[in-house]
Regions:
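Conserved HGGG/HGGXW glycine-rich cap/lid loop of the alpha/beta-hydrolase fold
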Residues: 18-65
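Glycine-rich phosphate-binding loop signature in dinucleotide/nucleotide-binding domains
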Residues: 21, 89-92, 326
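Flexible "cap/lid" subdomain of the alpha/beta-hydrolase fold that forms the substrate-access gate
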Residues: 1-3, 15, 61-97, 101-295
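Active-site loop/turn elements of alpha/beta-hydrolase fold enzymes
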Residues: 58, 125, 302
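Active-site helix-initiating loop/hinge in glycosyltransferases
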Residues: 31, 74, 100, 310-311
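Conserved beta-strand scaffold positions in the cores of enzyme catalytic domains, especially
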Residues: 3-7, 53-55, 296-299
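A short loop-to-beta-strand scaffold at the N-terminal edge of the catalytic core in hydrolase folds
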Residues: 10-19
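Catalytic active-site module of serine/aspartate enzymes centered on a nucleophile-bearing elbow/loop
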Residues: 292-326
């Protein structure tokens, strides 16, 4: 199906944005390593429900502009991109829904621009205030000599070289090792006491297993589309979001101590690795204390990290029911 894209001038750059449907706008924000295409299963159901669907390629991705400076990928810059899209469309306000990195982007858009955001929904990554020490320092303390991907991503060039060597293989490994099937396999491996965790000198893809077949949620044509998007963009811009985490902490620490005021919805899969992001802590259990008006908190059984792609019908129903009651 042919889609309607507009190159939207916003915040000094141009953002490739899918805009379809009529009604109250809903902004969908993708994560890493993804694309507007990650929301392909949401477009028609939301249009039919009477919403204007707005799905940008976040700066650095796909056909959107790719600023060269690392600091150009801060939460403050990206949230300004989104508000600029609303300004361009002459929309007073909107609902916002984000997955993976798109979730923090959505949470902070609601905090930075409360008058522009009617409701906020996050998939996979709940809202939590920043710690009193910077994220990179915190992760070094938590993971010590073990490998942690965010620390691996910090130095420009190293992760790019590994991940861009064979884009299709990279994406296949990432998608298929973090979905429900991949996570079950990882849990089985973790029970094998002879297997040692990766040390901090490992690479990102090291230890990931090649799937025999693509999972049902990811068709060959889907993988091809994502692959072509990253052949266009490379990994530099997308990885810079991780490199701005300490900058985000500096700029937004005080703001992060506020609770989300808008009607809120949080959805994740029972097998999403983000639930176990911090050793010994289940993040889903703590969801609720950082929101003033959390209407929905859903854990979908047998779903991994790619929430709205692995369980589109369930996610669409939860989100549309939530929005209908606002």
């Amino acid at each position: 199906m042919r889609r309607n894209f507009i190159e939207v001038p916003t915040n000094g750059i141009k953002i490739n944005t899918l805009i379809e449907g009529e009604g109250k706008p809903v902004i969908f924000v993708h994560g890493w390593p993804e694309s507007w295409y990650s929301w392909r299963h949401q477009i028609e159901p939301f249009k039919k429900a009477g919403y204007k669907v707005i799905i940008p390629d976040i700066r650095g991705y796909g056909n959107s502009e790719k600023p060269k400076k690392v600091n150009s990928y801060s939460l403050r810059e990206i949230t300004n991109d989104l508000i600029g899209i609303l300004d361009f469309l002459k929309e007073k306000d909107a609902h916002i829904i984000g997955h993976d990195w798109g979730a923090p982007i959505s949470w902070y858009t609601s905090l930075l621009f409360p008058e522009r955001i009617l409701s906020v929904s996050g998939l996979s990554v709940p809202f939590n205030p920043f710690n009193e020490i910077s994220p990179v320092t915190l992760f070094k303390d938590l993971y010590k000599d073990a490998f942690f991907y965010i620390l691996y991503f910090q130095k420009v060039g190293i992760a790019e070289k590994e991940l861009e060597n064979n884009i299709k293989k990279t994406l296949r490994l990432i998608y298929c090792n973090s979905d429900s099937f991949g996570m079950k396999k990882m849990i089985d491996n973790a029970s094998n006491k002879n297997l040692k965790p990766k040390d901090k000198n490992s690479t990102f893809l090291e230890g990931m297993t090649e799937p025999e077949n693509l999972p049902k949620w990811l068709k060959e044509e889907d993988l091809e589309y994502f692959t072509n998007e990253f052949k266009k963009s490379g990994m530099y811009g997308p990885l810079n979001k991780y490199r701005c985490m300490d900058l985000d902490w500096q700029e937004l620490f005080k703001l992060s101590l506020n609770k989300i005021k808008q009607p809120s919805c949080f959805i994740t899969g029972s097998l999403d690795p983000v639930n176990f992001f911090i050793p010994g802590v289940n993040l889903f259990d703590s969801v609720g204390e950082n929101y003033e008006n959390l209407k929905v908190k859903e854990l979908i059984d047998d779903v991994g990290h790619w929430t709205q792609q692995e369980a589109p019908d369930q996610v669409n129903k939860i989100l549309l029911d939530f929005l209908e009651k606002i």
